[in-house]
Amino acid sequence: MVCKVCGQKAQVEMRSRGLALCREHYLDWFVKETERAIRRHRMLLPGERVLVAVSGGKDSLALWDVLSRLGYQAVGLHIELGIGEYSKRSLEVTQAFARERGLELLVVDLKEAYGFGVPELARLSGRVACSACGLSKRYIINQVAVEEGFRVVATGHNLDDEAAVLFGNLLNPQEETLSRQGPVLPEKPGLAARVKPFYRFSEREVLSYTLLRGIRYLHEECPNAKGAKSLLYKEALNLVERSMPGAKLRFLDGFLEKIRPRLDVGEEVALRECERCGYPTTGAVCAFCRMWDAVYRRAKKRKLLPEEVSFRPRVKPLRAG
């Protein structure tokens, strides 16, 4: 197996693309493909300041690395979720990455900001841990982006992630949800734009970039992810991919190019300001504030919080690197 560009020994073979490349040309190809996706979907302006959501895993650190190499002012945001040793190691890896490259890192500690980490939040809210965690992360990432002056947030979602989400959405189809799936969610008042520059890279392709660049990342998965439906969807799609290389990419591209443009969701849902935090919501109080208000009420009943303490939605990130 030789590199298609130079004829030297290939380090990465991509059956789905009919391509094999050596280390040097794979890294070049990966960066150029990312840049092509950014330009194709007008994700970012040249040299723009962008907030990168970083967990310490391979996808988010690789994205931070690539965006920095492409000349964007990429600032990392890490949320310490309070999930025991897993969260501690995630923060350590992220801080080391930022420190070694001289990159700016913002950190929000969920427990310091609101009094509870994800395990306690799940118990007190009555939600599944992934649901409570996901809602909190989405809210905090957007709030930090808006209040720190970022127009756009970039996340490391890859092809496997996006194909699995699409698979799940098609099993339980809702036009409004399907119409929102894609590599870009545009900016709105009070809502930063969301972009996914890695949406056409498989998990293996991102991993290959991470390893060949020598990026140290957290290998372990979140302990709360065990049993998640998304893992089942990924397993099913991997089974298809093994027999039909390129199936996941065709599945996602086909939806984005042929089906999504035809989805008519009618008038957009009207957004208003949340009475508690002022951020956009469809009701009087947003889901984030409702959840945390309920958590504080239950915590007080269980004597976990003093009566005089009240939930305050605003957080101020710490600059850690």
UniProtKB/Swiss-Prot annotation:
The Gene Ontology biological process annotation of the record reads:
tRNA wobble position uridine thiolation
Names of the cofactor(s):
[4Fe-4S] cluster; Mg(2+)
Q: What is its EC number?
A: 2.8.1.15
Per UniProt, the keywords (alphabetical) are: 4Fe-4S, ATP-binding, Iron, Iron-sulfur, Isopeptide bond, Magnesium, Metal-binding, Nucleotide-binding, RNA-binding, Transferase, tRNA processing, tRNA-binding, Ubl conjugation, Zinc
Q: What class of enzyme is it?
A: transferase
Q: What regulates this protein's activity?
A: Enzymatic activity may be regulated by TtuB conjugation.
Q: What happens when the gene is disrupted?
A: Disruption of this gene completely abolishes the presence of m(5)s(2)U in tRNAs, although its precursor, 5-methyluridine (ribothymidine) is present; other nucleoside modifications remain unchanged. These deletion mutants exhibit a temperature-sensitive phenotype, they are unable to grow above 80 degrees Celsius.
Manner of cofactor binding, per the entry note? Binds 1 [4Fe-4S] cluster per subunit. The cluster is chelated by three Cys residues, the Fe with a free coordination site of the Fe-S cluster may contribute to an enzymatic role.
Q: What is this protein called?
A: tRNA-5-methyluridine(54) 2-sulfurtransferase
Instruction: Name its species.
Output: Thermus thermophilus (strain ATCC BAA-163 / DSM 7039 / HB27)
Q: What is the lineage of its organism?
A: Bacteria, Thermotogati, Deinococcota, Deinococci, Thermales
